[in-house]
């Protein structure tokens, strides 16, 4: 089997009631606003008629595919390891995000060729995954605008069945307000719900990170993630922070690549390791990170929701929660369009069962069917490689 053609459609969809924060870059709740979001729909065609599909990515990843798209033509689509290493070298001067946009549909293609879900190819066994509610950033527009609002939403999520809840705080934060919020959420849900905090690298100083971390200590949080404006990449800074607080750190969302992830973990910069199938070389790259992390005796936590993440998590032992990201008490938006699916697959606040879990799609490949009519109706740009 050989790759004959690759097509990437850029489709745009409206995201309602969200806008960029005026003093930062977070998407925050703003009633009446509309924000255009893009999705990159990839199809990899072969000479035997098998097609691999995936919708996701970002503009940086799509631009990088231009650097290796034609190299893929004529290649065996099952030789993912060869493709991974060749493309990794080609993108060595860049962040390598383009790798994931091609690797994921190659796994979908393999699953479709053999008539099994990706998790079966990976030796996976899980059929349901425990999820955590990962909030949108804090706003000042009547949504997540106070400690009480975060606490009330945590209770709502617990009642829906979520076993864990992660806060993303305000761009215009105040340390005492963040500290109050950390405590208020714990007081509201009690001791039997895992809680996490992700400031999204917003805290201005290391001192603020220490103050917030010690509040997490007092409230018994499971982890603190990407606290301050080093942007999550300072091994020395996070190693020192680990020495000053008890709450485990979850880092490496903003560190690219297998070797860099493991250097960060071995160097003592984190307790949990973050991996992302889109950011870290696709399913192939994220799986390498998961296995290497397992060899260190640590857990890996996958970033963001989606069918690729579900197939991957179903195949990894050393992982805890599926991230149901961008949930909000007054919106069904999750930061990416759900209109791309044709088969009822969805992510979002109410996408979990009463057991607090999401199902792993059991169809071939990624296990989902895309609505290509809807995608093409929203397409604004197409690239092809032959």
For each predicted feature, which ranges?
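Motif-centric detector for short Cys/His coordination patterns
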Residues: 1-41, 57-62, 69-77
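Flexible C-terminal active-site loop/helix
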Residues: 2-11, 15-18, 29-31, 37, ...
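Metal- or metallocofactor-binding catalytic centers and their adjacent structured scaffolds
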Residues: 5, 45-114
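Shared catalytic-loop signature of beta/alpha-barrel
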Residues: 22-23, 79, 214, 220, ...
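Ligand-binding pocket scaffold of soluble enzyme catalytic domains
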Residues: 36-38, 42, 47-51, 113-116, ...
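Conserved, mostly hydrophobic/aromatic
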Residues: 49, 68, 102, 115, ...
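Glycine-rich, aromatic-flanked loop segments that form ligand/cofactor-binding clefts
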Residues: 103-143
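Metal-dependent enolase-superfamily TIM-barrel catalytic cores that perform enediolate-based chemistry
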Residues: 128-245
